[in-house]
Swiss-Prot record:
GO terms for molecular function: protein tag activity; ubiquitin-like protein ligase binding. SMART domains: UBQ. There is a cross-link at K11 (Glycyl lysine isopeptide (Lys-Gly) (interchain with G-Cter in SUMO)). It comes from Xenopus laevis. Ubiquitin-like protein which can be covalently attached to target lysines either as a monomer or as a lysine-linked polymer. Does not seem to be involved in protein degradation and may function as an antagonist of ubiquitin in the degradation process. Plays a role in a number of cellular processes such as nuclear transport, DNA replication and repair, mitosis and signal transduction. Covalent attachment to its substrates requires prior activation by the E1 complex sae1-sae2 and linkage to the E2 enzyme ube2i. It is found in: Cytoplasm; Nucleus, PML body. Residues 93-94 form a propeptide. This is Small ubiquitin-related modifier 3.
């Protein structure tokens, strides 16, 4: 017999969440991440996969900028939610 100890402070909902990251070019990359993992992990993985620099792009959820320290739980993200990626706009005069 194996003893299974109930985890304290853990909700009955799944600890992982599936998120989609949608680029401006129409590409969609899916990630599975823990609800309490900082989104910087997902952001860096997306940049590595797409060959981009973190300085080149911005991530937004529901129109709001995402900070690297934010977690899916803090932003009340649900399974299959989409994060939008935008190229960093550099100011200039035409």
């Amino acid at each position: 017999m194996s003893e299974e100890k109930p985890k304290e402070g853990v909700k009955t909902e799944n600890d992982h969440i599936n998120l989609k990251v949608a680029g401006q070019d129409g590409s969609v990359v899916q990630f599975k991440i823990k609800r309490h993992t900082p989104l910087s992990k997902l952001m860096k993985a997306y940049c590595d996969r797409q060959g981009l620099s973190m300085r080149q792009i911005r991530f937004r959820f529901d129109g709001q900028p995402i900070n690297e320290t934010d977690t899916p739980a803090q932003l009340e993200m649900e399974d299959e939610d989409t994060i939008d990626v935008f190229q960093q706009q550099t100011g200039g005069v035409c």
